[in-house]
């Protein structure tokens, strides 16, 4: 038996095929999440998968740039596949400056990152997210977090929480400790705090030139506290920052269950475009990180030249599906119609048309199976009913309908399907 070698019959590394049960699970999640975004007044947007490489790399940081699928087209242009939707949205808004602000957009779409594939993590994957553009109000920060929590609840996540931080708080801490010049290496270490042992995180900082004493203090400060305790901490670091954060907390207390929220100064997010509040969502017993976001008040100015405050979040859809246990959704076939010869085909077509207009899914046998094989096939594809139209049925003016779940059979007048 010839054909393609095995590695060519499989998806490219880091990609996946979606068979019907998995794809219907994905579509179920899409319907659930998009309904939440729409209920908050957000409207759906889509952009090209391919962007100019310069657009993608503008504020990505070297680690993210290394993950971009980069290529030259036939005209020699440097292009890349989008790694998130925040950057493309910023580009779109850069030439749509006349849109009324704030803009509330959401998306459910594919993005691409050339990193190391892991369990539940692919190089091509779906993101659901929102972008609120044109507001610096603390109410905007609270709204986006509300929407994130509502999305997780609607998706079926019962055991989840959101860790919140503010990059400006970390910067103030580093200034206070006299290590602001080491910001990049400290951010890199903090971003690993939830994944690596303490000594490894300390080693990243000391390896970058931070003294062990200061590294220990940073590690100890970047710990989990309540949202209310964080207000006091931020006031100590910077009064204006504390006052702004206190307002966000007030709005959150009025709108979300506060037990879902924690403050953690180790949450800094890997993307370089974040400028203020940042947050990540964790779901399930194993605290699976399913998404996050934050404020990026400088990003749009890079593209449009106009200072524009903005924030948003993105959820890794496959990660969320894994965390809430939605991997397969079966969609049974309603009716499978079996006929014995071509003389009955016009009646089968009429019955199928009538049932389809009523919203049922119907398959008509292609004439390649005997009755026994047709029954076996109908059971394998999950058909709920099989309809038999033979000579005896036509002589009586009926069709025979067998319920494959209840194992009962009834006859129905053929005339009711021919009107």
From Swiss-Prot:
Residue ranges crossing the lipid bilayer per the database entry: none
Pfam families xrefs: HGTP_anticodon, tRNA-synt_His
Record-stated family: Belongs to the class-II aminoacyl-tRNA synthetase family.
PANTHER family from the UniProt entry: HISTIDINE--TRNA LIGASE, MITOCHONDRIAL-RELATED, HISTIDYL-TRNA SYNTHETASE
Signal peptide feature range: none
Protein name: Histidine--tRNA ligase
Listed HAMAP family: His_tRNA_synth, HisZ
Domain of life where this protein originates: Archaea
Alphabetic keyword roster: Aminoacyl-tRNA synthetase, ATP-binding, Cytoplasm, Ligase, Nucleotide-binding, Protein biosynthesis
Alphabetized GO MF terms: ATP binding; histidine-tRNA ligase activity
Cell location: Cytoplasm
InterPro entries for this protein: aa-tRNA-synth_II (IPR006195), aa-tRNA-synth_II/BPL/LPL (IPR045864), Anticodon-bd (IPR004154), Anticodon-bd_dom_sf (IPR036621), His-tRNA-ligase (IPR015807), HisRS-like_core (IPR041715), HisRS/HisZ (IPR004516), HisZ (IPR004517)
Enzyme class: ligase
Organism expressing this protein natively: Pyrobaculum aerophilum (strain ATCC 51768 / DSM 7523 / JCM 9630 / CIP 104966 / NBRC 100827 / IM2)
PROSITE patterns xrefs: AA_TRNA_LIGASE_II
GO CC field: cytoplasm
Primary localization: cytoplasm
Record field: catalytic activity: tRNA(His) + L-histidine + ATP = L-histidyl-tRNA(His) + AMP + diphosphate + H(+)
GO terms, biological process: histidyl-tRNA aminoacylation; L-histidine biosynthetic process
Enzyme Commission code(s) on record: 6.1.1.21
